[in-house]
């Protein structure tokens, strides 16, 4: 069986954060980086991304605004918000508007973030498997309904 891809999109306007993240995690995952929400949307349109990690405070569009803006077009990726600022209102917005899986404070602990990312990939995988099983159930249910109608008509 083919291993599932482990693609992460990390968005941060600070290049040194992107470089450090990629250096820390590239041996475990395929990392795509973007310096803006616009670049992030472009990568999402081109690549199969399972995890989106974004900084909250960026020029032009906050992390929460970005995550909320992509929900309709990209509903499946698991979302993680990184921020250097604790703000209750942002946490609430992140959960309610951005459907954030985890809210993590900077500076992050590499080992803890890796565990969070691994858990996020597990959640993604389980959701994907559930979706496929539901499609299979619907197909089988439709077949059974058809067979029942055929039997009732004969």
Model-derived regions, located:
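Helix N-cap/capping motif at the beta->alpha junctions
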Residues: 33-42, 63
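Conserved acidic segment of CheY-like receiver
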Residues: 2-16, 20-22, 33, 52-53
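Alpha4 helix (beta4-alpha4-beta5 surface) of REC/receiver domains from two-component response regulators
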Residues: 65, 86-102
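C-terminal output/effector regions of signal-responsive regulators
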Residues: 128, 132-154
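Conserved phosphotransfer cores of two-component systems
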Residues: 45-47, 70-76, 97-98
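C-terminal output helix
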Residues: 89, 108-117, 121
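Receiver (REC) domain active-site loop signature in two-component systems and cognate sites
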Residues: 58
């Amino acid at each position: 069986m083919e291993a599932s891809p482990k693609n992460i999109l990390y968005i941060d306007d600070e290049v040194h954060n992107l470089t450090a993240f990629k250096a820390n995690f590239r041996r475990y995952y395929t990392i795509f980086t973007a310096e803006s929400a616009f670049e992030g949307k472009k990568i999402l349109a081109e690549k199969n991304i399972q995890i989106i990690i974004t900084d909250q405070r960026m020029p032009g569009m906050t992390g929460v605004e970005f995550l909320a803006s992509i929900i309709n077009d990209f509903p499946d990726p698991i979302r993680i918000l990184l921020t250097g600022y604790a703000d209750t209102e942002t946490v609430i917005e992140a959960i309610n508007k951005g459907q954030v899986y985890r809210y993590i404070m900077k500076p992050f602990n590499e080992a803890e973030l890796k565990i969070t990312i691994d858990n996020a990939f597990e959640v993604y995988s389980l959701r994907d498997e559930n979706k496929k099983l539901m499609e299979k159930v619907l197909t089988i249910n439709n077949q059974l309904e058809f067979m029942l109608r055929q039997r009732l008509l004969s």
